[in-house]
């Protein structure tokens, strides 16, 4: 009678997981449900009834699961995917929903652990498993850093890549222009690309578009009718296009290491493909931004990137809610001296 819950951040991936779980469990007579922010009220009430009665055994959901009105009966296992995208309080809220005499097992999955999580693997009683090999047929993504003043040089490269049958992401950190920030926007970049090259078929996807508009752009990109998809970080998870071989990130200095690594992972997913990621930056790089760029050029290993992120940002609070910041150790260093913790 125990309930298993799998939590994802993106609605697209939730539907994929639900489809996969339904296929795996089709002969087991195990009832499962999907709960997202788009779930209609009538359907939600039916799902909640199943949770209260214990009829529902597996619940797959997004942040919607955190709502107070969602009841979790006999919760025995919590699987949190893309763990770096969830806050401490959110994960704690799930445990608050459980029976007082039942503490569920928890499995956290992440390609790039946040500093606090990495520190917890050293201090806390956590069992850690690492998959430190690339999937079969996958090659590391080559990463380079360029000043935004050289962005015109990328047009020819885009045209060559697309003529060879591959596709590219052009990622921006903002949708529309801001009076306070000097950054490249998605809408302006799409217009600029179309003006620079009549050969490129350019699409656009961001959070302000309707669901139908987003689905249309994403499907056209997957089908290959769009060469370059101008986008925001909405494509960080859940976007699997094996034909995409180039990721260009505008104003990369504004993004964290974990996010940069996740975005880079959107390309090079095809068999034996050599993919590239270009990080564009505006103005002079600060010390922290330069350290992030160097880390991205240096390695494709998510765990190594997490260690560098820990060094840059600090470990945060093991018993608090801060997920980064200094631990104020006077002599010890968490990364350098990790082997002493076991002793």
State where each predicted segment sits:
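Loop/turn-to-beta-strand initiation segments
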Residues: 31, 54-58, 74-77, 101-107, ...
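Conserved nucleic-acid-binding Ia/Ib motif block in the N-terminal RecA-like helicase ATPase lobe
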Residues: 13-59, 199-204
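Conserved interdomain linker/interface between the two RecA-like ATPase lobes of SF2 helicase motors
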Residues: 125-189
């Amino acid at each position: 009678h125990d309930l298993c819950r799998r939590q994802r951040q993106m609605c697209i991936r939730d539907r994929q997981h639900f489809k996969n779980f339904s296929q795996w469990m089709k002969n087991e007579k195990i009832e499962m449900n999907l709960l997202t922010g788009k779930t209609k009220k009538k359907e939600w009430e039916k799902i909640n009834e199943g949770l209260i009665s214990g009829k529902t055994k597996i619940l797959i959901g997004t942040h919607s699961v955190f709502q107070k009105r969602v009841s979790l009966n006999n919760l025995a296992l919590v699987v949190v995917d893309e763990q770096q995208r969830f806050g401490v309080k959110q994960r704690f809220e799930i445990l608050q929903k459980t029976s007082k005499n039942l503490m569920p097992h928890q499995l956290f999955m992440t390609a790039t652990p946040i500093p606090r999580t990495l520190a917890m693997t050293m201090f806390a009683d956590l069992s850690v498993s690492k998959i430190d090999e690339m999937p079969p047929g996958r090659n590391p993504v080559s990463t380079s850093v360029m000043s935004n003043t050289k962005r015109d040089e990328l047009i020819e490269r885009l045209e060559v890549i697309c003529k060879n049958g591959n596709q590219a992401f052009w990622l921006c950190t903002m949708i529309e222009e801001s009076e306070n920030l000097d950054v490249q926007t998605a809408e302006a970049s799409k217009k600029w690309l179309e003006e620079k090259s009549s050969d490129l078929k350019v699409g656009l996807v961001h959070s302000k578009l309707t669901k139908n508009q987003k689905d249309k752009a994403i499907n056209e990109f997957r089908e290959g009718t769009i060469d370059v998809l101008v986008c925001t970080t909405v494509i960080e998870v859940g976007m699997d296009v094996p034909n995409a071989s180039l990721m260009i990130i505008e104003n990369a200095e504004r993004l964290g290491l974990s996010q940069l690594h996740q975005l880079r992972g959107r390309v090079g997913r095809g068999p034996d493909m050599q993919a590239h990621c270009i990080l564009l930056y505006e103005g002079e790089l600060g010390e922290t931004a330069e350290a992030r760029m160097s880390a991205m050029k240096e390695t494709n290993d998510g765990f190594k990137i997490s260690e560098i992120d820990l060094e840059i940002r600090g470990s945060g609070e093991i018993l608090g809610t801060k997920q980064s910041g200094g631990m104020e150790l006077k002599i010890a260093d968490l990364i350098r001296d990790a082997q002493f913790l076991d002793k």
